[in-house]
Amino acid sequence: MEQVAKCKSLVAIFRDDKKMLDGPHAVGFDIEKDKAFHIDVEQCGIRKISITSDVDVSVFDLYALFSRIERLLMLFDGAFISLSEIQLSKSDTVDEKILHSCEEHFMKGRLSYFMSADFCNYSIEKMLGFDSIITADLYCKWENLLDELDVVHQMYLYSLSNSGMTVDIKCAFLIELAEPLVEIVKKHTNFYASLTPGARG
């Protein structure tokens, strides 16, 4: 059986092709899953997300955690920022060549919704400042919400992406997402309490 590559660190570098990212902004927090992780997000001209663990963990677990953080940051920015590179390091079990091959695999396997459509790139630099909002508690709530949203969130991201879908398809997706989103909002807040799903014919 092929050995799963493991390491202790993932660093992702983002650069905006059209403007310098403002800063300095920085936030750090720790989360406990099966293993403990420390996350740092720094921004000044570029953005850097660093995820570290005290022990070797699967590179796929590191990348999955990174992807969830990236999607959370997208809510604050209003669009995805271009990912320039992923760096995997600090492994006690595999050499750098294997880690480099994993880096290439992750970069080539990026889904198309990580490239936001032009209409998402507003002239303002961001919608919300991540450094004043993100905490370990907020991230844990985000993980739970992602599980609850499931395919709804992915459809939303594809509707805002530069994926080649026509505008009418994107609009149809967004309209279809209204009902499940309202149900989730009703479940967690007092908003839209009077709305009920209509009969489908």
Language model features with spans:
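Amphipathic alpha-helical interface elements
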Residues: L145-G201
